[in-house]
Amino acid sequence: MILKDSLLTLLKEKQMAAITVKELCELADVNRSTFYAHYLDLYDLLAQIEDELIEELNMYLSTYNFTKEKEALQMTEKLLEYLATRQDECKTLLNENSDSSFQKKVEDVAHQFIMKNWMAVNRLDQNFSEYLSAFIVSGSIQMMKMWINNGMDKSPK
């Protein structure tokens, strides 16, 4: 956990490519051998942080029935509440210092969820649904980034 927190701290200040294992271990006050006993490299550590958040996001999405408008609105509210509980990690992983892999993973999860749940309900053409999903997902992620960067100045409701 301390290595994950230390990497997130460093990502607030500098680009991922500029961070070294030595620097991370000094901040975390652990030996490099301890780091390498758990991770292949810094990108492996970053991927584990991202995957943990993505797994939680998938759990949130799977609890809602997107076909019912009321539940779709509740789902959006719950997602924003989830982001609020993981604000620091999400803000850091979606900033310009991190690589784009986390945003891409979030986009993929959201796209799959929309295609699985929305296309069938609305009986839309797959090709049209792909474009519509890309539009919705991109806009939603930009809105979430803006909301987080503005200190979550609006209520999830």
Each predicted region: which residue ranges?
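Short, hydrophobic secondary-structure boundary micro-motifs
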Residues: 19-20, 91-93, 156
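Amphipathic alpha-helical packing segments from all-alpha helical-bundle domains
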Residues: 97-123, 127-134, 138-141
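Generic structural signal for secondary-structure transition and capping sites
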Residues: 16, 88-89, 119
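C-terminal peripheral helix-coil segments that are non-catalytic and often amphipathic
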Residues: 137-138, 146-157
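Helical hydrophobic small-molecule/effector-binding pocket
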Residues: 69-115
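Short amphipathic alpha-helical interface segments enriched in basic and hydrophobic/aromatic residues
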Residues: 8-12, 58, 84, 115, ...
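Secondary-structure edge/capping motif, primarily at the C-terminal ends of alpha-helices
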Residues: 60-64, 90-93, 121, 147, ...
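An amphipathic alpha-helix adjacent to DNA-recognition modules
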Residues: 1-8, 12, 17-21, 26-29, ...
